[in-house]
Amino acid sequence: MENINEYKICKADPEEWARYHAIYRLTKFNEWMSLSFKSDIDRYAKTNFCYWVILDNKRVGGAFIKPNIFKCIFTIPPFHNHNELIKVLTLYVATISDKCNSIVVPDADINDIDYYKNSGFCLERIDKLMICPTNESDITLKERYKFMFPRREHAEEMAHLYFETYSNNNLQYIATQSYEFQVSSVQVFFDHIKSMNVTNEWSTLVYDKVTKKFIGACTVSLVNDLPYVLDFVVHPDFQRKGLASMMMQRTLKLFFNSYPAIRLNVTEGNDAEAFYDKLGFISLSRKGYMSKLI
């Protein structure tokens, strides 16, 4: 085993780093099922957080590093010591981080979980990126409901819907999210579609004419060249009535002539897993969300 002090962390040229990342990580850890090799490179080509790990004046790995977070790690053959690479990165990130907050790794390769644990990390959850081909299907909505497009004036009602729905989730980290967190999530949606020049007509709100409330939402933006579902909720009082299927079928049909597939993220153990499987979604990758107190 090498002496940890013999390693160095050096800033990388983002475009060059992105080429290595695409080859040494994405070819074996399919996080996004990118539409092209170029898009894998372009995703990081203008960022400012790409780093090399150096040993004996040779690049042996790379990572995307910010205070309190590192991700996208990869090794460069013939170096394959993931345990040491993770240890080196953990020690370095601790020196640039806020000691009041944890260090997180949001995309840990499942095969490396034990190595992260060796460096003091805990596995909080496993997330799965899922994908489904767009398709055409007939949609019949009951008379008491109607589809609407989300607008900023709906933000407060959407936040209430999110809060009331996610509070009933079977996963604690979701169920304990605050109302303020959901307000922020709604804001992120509107900001993201604006920055990506995405129409709000990609997204769906379901309005109940009887209660005069929004009871469902499927918000969609563009991530890595494909539509990506940011939030998908149906109010607990209206679940198991076919509304979720109708919203997702509308979304899959909407993109049938313009995009080959849509993607979303789900946490393993979430009740929604079975629903997405029923609609034809398949997992692209499983990645661990790790955290460590400094």
Which functions belong to the PLM regions below?
Residues 2-20, 146-173:
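A short beta-loop-alpha structural element at the N-terminal edge
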Residues 84-100, 246-261, 277, 282:
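Conserved acyl-CoA
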